[in-house]
């Protein structure tokens, strides 16, 4: 069975048992009345069952309801069908004030019907020939308004300065100021020039997201013809059907696939309604993607540390034990489905590098947009500053130093040998994003 943990807030007067049963029925075989055609099938075989209910500590009239769904309810290899059933009409149910899908346990038999990520972590490292450190990226800014030639210039400067990747922002598609084909050509020219000058393999996430699947595939095919290593997709706004289609193409044609999660906070930010990002992350690993944005803990975007590390492990590891202290409701076995590299991006700069290296480890992409292009000396010095900071943190970690305790000292030491890093530290030394997270863990029993 597929197991689901729902946070249920019933309407006043509705007992939790009735609410849990209603969720199970509405998201599987049930409807609002008994129908004659119930007798033409075996409902006991197909109906969802609410098998356990527990109150949420510290919350009045809020419960975690566990529901089991028979596997025969779902089409093989289709995240679209799985979500249509589990989070379809039930979220508008009048008997509930609010409903949130906290987690899913995907059985191994169902996991094996999915291709998953086109390549996975180890294959990506082998393609890039880069080991033993996080990868460095940069989102080109301003995100909208640059001409294709100026956009390509920024890509070149960042890659030449020492970054591994540059990135289209999520809303860069094919606008009047920069049509997609022009952007692809100038970005490809930039990364090949940077590769020749640095001797390193470089990449730029060319956003293939489009208004139709046919147009999306046309862009991905053109990227492959240019010989670039990676393309990008906005998987929530683009949709799971489009994403899975693109992931299959990327595996067949040797392209890495970077995934942006634009629109996720509409779905996952509120604690009592919607669904958590850990569910969206599991769905992405099934649908397919080699990278996905996963928050930073320390930057400008929402993300509590324990929650973030919980779904980072769900993305990367082959087997994850149940751990309610990190928001993980079920043990999950991925049966060798390739892992996904988490991307830390949003309001981060060189002073965050020790914390990011300590939190995410080696298998991550640390992506500095404003933290590269906002350098007072220009784009290339901004990239140099980030690369020096990263190399200093990795060296210090490998020497056994405590990045959490000595991070500022490590960055200051490195800045003595890098004027670019010293200038970056001076510009961003006072920049912090200290706000309480909205989505937090429940208190322990």
From Swiss-Prot:
UniProt cofactor note: Binds 1 Mg(2+) ion per subunit.
Cofactor: Mg(2+)
Leader sequence residues: none
Broad class of where this protein is predominantly found: plastid
Alphabetical list of InterPro entries matching this protein: RuBisCO, RuBisCo_large_chain_AS, RuBisCO_lsu_C, RuBisCO_lsu_C_sf, RuBisCO_lsu_fd_N, RuBisCO_lsu_N_sf, RuBisCO_lsuI
UniProt site positions, description: Transition state stabilizer: 300
Record keywords, A-Z: Calvin cycle, Carbon dioxide fixation, Chloroplast, Disulfide bond, Lyase, Magnesium, Metal-binding, Monooxygenase, Oxidoreductase, Photorespiration, Photosynthesis, Plastid
Keyword Magnesium part of the UniProt annotation: yes
MF GO annotations: magnesium ion binding; monooxygenase activity; ribulose-bisphosphate carboxylase activity
Location in the cell: Plastid, Chloroplast
Binding site for Mg(2+): 167, 169-170
One Gene Ontology term, aspect cellular component: chloroplast
Catalytic activity: 2 (2R)-3-phosphoglycerate + 2 H(+) = D-ribulose 1,5-bisphosphate + CO2 + H2O; D-ribulose 1,5-bisphosphate + O2 = 2-phosphoglycolate + (2R)-3-phosphoglycerate + 2 H(+)
Binding site for substrate: 89, 139, 143, 261, 293, 345
Domain of life: Eukaryota
Enzyme Commission number(s) of this protein: 4.1.1.39
Modified residues (N6-carboxylysine): 167
Protein family according to the UniProt entry: Belongs to the RuBisCO large chain family. Type I subfamily.
Function (record text): RuBisCO catalyzes two reactions: the carboxylation of D-ribulose 1,5-bisphosphate, the primary event in carbon dioxide fixation, as well as the oxidative fragmentation of the pentose substrate in the photorespiration process. Both reactions occur simultaneously and in competition at the same active site.
Assembly notes: Heterohexadecamer of 8 large chains and 8 small chains; disulfide-linked. The disulfide link is formed within the large subunit homodimers.
PANTHER family listed in its UniProt record: RIBULOSE BISPHOSPHATE CARBOXYLASE, RIBULOSE BISPHOSPHATE CARBOXYLASE LARGE CHAIN
Note: The basic functional RuBisCO is composed of a large chain homodimer in a 'head-to-tail' conformation. In form I RuBisCO this homodimer is arranged in a barrel-like tetramer with the small subunits forming a tetrameric 'cap' on each end of the 'barrel'.
NCBIfam families referenced in this protein's UniProt entry, alphabetically: PRK04208.1 (NF003252)
Protein name: Ribulose bisphosphate carboxylase large chain
Organism, scientific name: Callicarpa dichotoma
